[in-house]
Amino acid sequence: FTQVIAENEIVGTLLWSRGITITALLVALLSPIMGAVADRGGYRKVYLIFWTIICILGSFLLYFPQPSQVVFALIAFIIGNVGFEMGSVFCNAFLPDIAPKDKIGRVSGYGWSFGYVGGLIALILGLVLFINPEVPHFNLSKESFEHIRATNIMVAIWFAVFCLPTFLFVKQGKTDLSEKGMVVKDS
């Protein structure tokens, strides 16, 4: 982004940090409300799937921006990042359902560490398959940075595939359905 999409590294770094700030503000505003709605209405899994799809969509969209398409790239980044952060909120909400109270920290730590291992494996695959080869695989163009942009599609697919076990096998515990007006109070 800072070297190809933005006009220079200084402007690119400034704009990227603004994208992160916008993400943080959106997540800070959405998390309490969405969390209360999901907890009180019994929709944690639905929202986990929804926000994960938003994250995957944002990652996929990052393939398309060309040099100087700063706004498009930032919007795609913010979409993906908000999706990831909001998905994390709902993923964390499942911890009491899947781990005994005294093991929640350990299970959470394992989850994060497996996530980082998966991210490192995806990074290595991206480097080996797309970025480092002299002649990129899949006939991707180095001139238009397609070989680098394609890593976003790979990450979107990677994330989608490795989210499936969670979607299929993690069960949501019982929730207390909200009385009218309690969602606002709870948020």
Name these PLM-found stretches.
Residues F1-K171, L177-S178, V184-S187:
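Membrane-embedded alpha-helical bundles of multi-pass transporters/translocases
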